[in-house]
A protein has these predicted regions:
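Active-site nucleotide/adenylate-binding loops and adjacent lid/helix of ATP-dependent enzymes
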Residues: 108-205, 225
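Glycine-rich phosphate/pyrophosphate-binding beta-alpha loops
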Residues: 164, 236-248, 290-304
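Conserved metal-phosphate-binding beta-hairpin within the catalytic cores
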Residues: 231-233, 264-299
Length: 342
């Protein structure tokens, strides 16, 4: 029996992940989910759900360990980036009797920090957009000029932002009323971006990059014990807060090869997601890594590449091979939900 504890079971990826695991393991699989919420959308796919304390509270790991013992957990699969670090640090101590499905703590810390990630990839000779670290308003204005502003847009990124948090596309000449009415509050002028940061102390870790005008790609990748097992390239045609709302599986060997190079260089393990965007000359350049199961993993699974099931099989010591995806498979998201009985 494979018994898996899923932490942060209320994340965007949880339902698709549970569906993928159920499809890959018709028998011999027990899923236990935990979250700080009283209920989560993936509950119908779980054998048991438990509410746990906040991850930063002293009782969080105590409850995780108790549940592992109670349910005979063989594998712990953290679904949030923050909990990947926590579980990775505990894998040799309190979780020594289980397999943690995730990258090592040092790899997650690099992958989740865009400044450290870009510096590491630059040192490895991987193609990147031009970028500069900005540490105060003066360096923000200076970097913007160096990267071509106001003639070209530039992109301001929080080093530790996820889900498009801390992301600003800086363009010249945007009317103030247009920025006021913007739902996303993403496109701003340099003056507005600087004003939003005026007086902030301490200054957050920020970087400014060139704007990439090409197509955006999101690559689901699978590595196990340092070996590349395959990936699926998805073109992101529309997105909202970092989550693809219209995406298609495409045949782009060049993008897949770049994803392999980045994954191998950084050292992510199991299922991760690497995002690229095309430069003016069409080259796919790295945007970021999500060192966890992505929110749109269901598209790769629907296309025939069940990365989560293969990852779990490998973690359980079984032989498994990732099937190639069906090119052209597309997802168009709409709002739906899980109805729980009263």
């Amino acid at each position: 029996m494979i018994s898996v504890l899923l932490t942060s079971a209320g994340t965007d990826s949880a339902v698709a992940l549970c569906e993928a695991l159920r499809a890959g393991f018709s028998t011999g699989l027990r899923l236990v989910g935990v979250d700080t919420r009283t209920a989560v959308a993936c509950m119908p796919w779980l054998d048991h759900f438990a509410r746990v304390p906040l991850r930063r509270s002293p009782g969080f790991m105590d409850e995780v360990v108790r549940l592992c013992e109670q349910h005979g957990i063989t594998h712990v699969w953290p679904l949030s980036t923050e909990e990947q670090i926590i579980m990775a640090l505990e894998r040799a101590t309190r979780l020594a009797g289980t397999v943690v499905i995730g990258s090592s703590a040092d790899v997650v810390e690099v992958a989740n920090d865009k400044v450290r990630l870009y510096d590491a990839c630059a040192a490895g000779g991987l193609p990147l957009p031009a970028y500069q670290v900005v540490g105060d308003p003066a360096s923000l204005h200076r970097a913007a000029r160096d990267l071509g502003y106001p003639d070209r847009p530039v992109v301001l990124k929080a080093a530790l932002g996820t889900g498009a948090a801390g992301l600003k596309i800086i363009r010249a000449g945007i009317p103030r009323l247009e920025m006021f009415h913007s739902r996303l509050n993403r496109d701003v002028t340099l003056e507005v971006a600087a004003a939003q940061l005026d007086g902030v102390s301490p200054w957050p870790s920020l970087m400014l990059t060139e704007y990439l005008p090409g197509e955006e790609f999101s690559v689901d990748v699978l590595r196990f014990r340092g070996a590349w097992k395959g990936g699926v390239v998805r073109r992101r045609d529309e997105s909202l807060f970092g989550l693809a709302t219209d995406a298609t599986v495409v045949d782009r060997p060049d993008v897949l090869e770049q994803a392999r190079r980045v994954a191998d260089h950084v050292g992510v393990e199991f299922v991760s997601n690497i995002q690229f965007r095309g430069a003016e000359d069409g080259r796919p350049l790295l945007m970021e890594i999500n060192p966890r199961v992505p929110g749109t993993i269901g598209l790769s699974v629907a296309a025939g590449s069940n990365l989560p099931a293969v990852a779990l099989a490998l973690a359980a010591g079984r032989d498994a091979v990732l099937a190639p995806p069906r090119i052209g498979t597309r997802i168009i998201r709409y709002f739906a939900g899980t109805v729980l009985p009263g």
